[in-house]
A protein has these predicted regions:
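Formylglycine-dependent sulfatase
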Residues: 1-143
Length: 143
């Protein structure tokens, strides 16, 4: 069986007040992704800050266990970057590419992605076109 490709999108400070969660704010592209993928309706933030929440999603550990008790740009870091899901995916044969911001390390190289596509800022108008370009050019599978 061919392993499925995985596209992990994590928007910054979006919240749940968007269309897929039953609210009136139209987000047709997010709705389409929710219709065709996975939508988590019974999830919660593991930490009160961006870095701690992201680190929990990417390691499967609470912030007090993974070390990300504050913001990465304020000096907090993971205890062990080998716990990042990227390493688990690589061991399963996946290729990983980062487009935009991960916000669990000031040095993106420590995360372990196979490729990092740098954009000047993490705003959607810069990140989305780069993501579309990478996907259209094609990636070795699985990704």
């Amino acid at each position: 069986m061919t392993p499925p490709n995985i596209l992990y999108l994590h928007s910054h400070d979006t919240g749940r007040y968007v269309q897929p969660y039953g609210h009136q704010i139209p987000t047709p592209n997010i709705q389409m992704l929710a219709d065709q993928g996975a939508l988590f309706r019974q999830a919660f933030s593991a930490g009160p800050t961006c870095s701690g929440s992201r680190a929990s999603l990417l390691t499967g550990q609470y912030p007090h266990s993974n070390g990300m008790m504050g913001l990465a740009h304020r000096g907090w870091r993971l205890n062990d970057y080998g716990q990042h899901i990227i390493h688990t995916l690589r061991d399963a044969g996946y290729r990983s590419e980062l487009i935009g911001e991960q916000h669990v390390s000031e040095d993106l190289e420590t995360l372990g992605y196979d490729a990092i596509h740098r954009v000047d800022r993490s705003h959607v108008e810069l990140v989305a076109p780069e993501a579309v370009r990478v996907l259209r050019e094609g990636l070795p599978e699985p990704w």
